[in-house]
Amino acid sequence: MHLFETMKLDKGFIPRLDYHYQRISTSSEHLGFQFDHLFWKQFIHNIKTLHSKGVFRLKVTLNKEGELNYELFPIPDKPFFTARLVQQKKNIDKVIITNKTTERDYLTHNHFTDLILIYDEDGKILEFDIGNVMIQERDKLYTPTYKGDMLPGCMRQSLIDQGKVIEKDFYIEEFKEKIKSSQINVYLINSLRAVSYTHLTLPTKR
């Protein structure tokens, strides 16, 4: 198992870098991974210097012994995403849910839609498989409360810290009704793409 961070590298600049550093640092401490703070900063500096032109998806991985590696990928244009609701699998280790690790099997799906929007057994809307969820209702922006039941994303925390997003829980039946009646809009939020409109597909009754 590795820890990893997915970031946007934009002409040598990484948005929300401090949030990514804080998350991987905290997770490494919780999980007993070696993590050299000075080495991380030098490692990231070298990446930014080497790749000062172009826009990339940057994936940085950390193993238990403290070794860092990185990969760069293009970022495809994606004006919006499609998603469907899926109930969270049972008996998932909270460590896996709340830390960004390479143990991601619980998020796999058949990609009939681009994304899945996960809810728990109580019906609470949680997160997308590749980011958090932001819900626009009237002139307010909301994201579910964090209670150790999802991955706390860097973009999510940044928006909360800026006072742009309010924590509020939505539950599935009310959520679906508000989607059907166009009372809410749904967005994927993550540090790579910032904010992306998401079209939610609801099952039709036969």
Model-found features: residue ranges?
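A short, hydrophobic C-terminal helix/tail in secreted or cell-surface proteins
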Residues: 201-206
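Helix-start/capping segments and mature chain N-termini
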Residues: 1-50, 54-57, 61-200
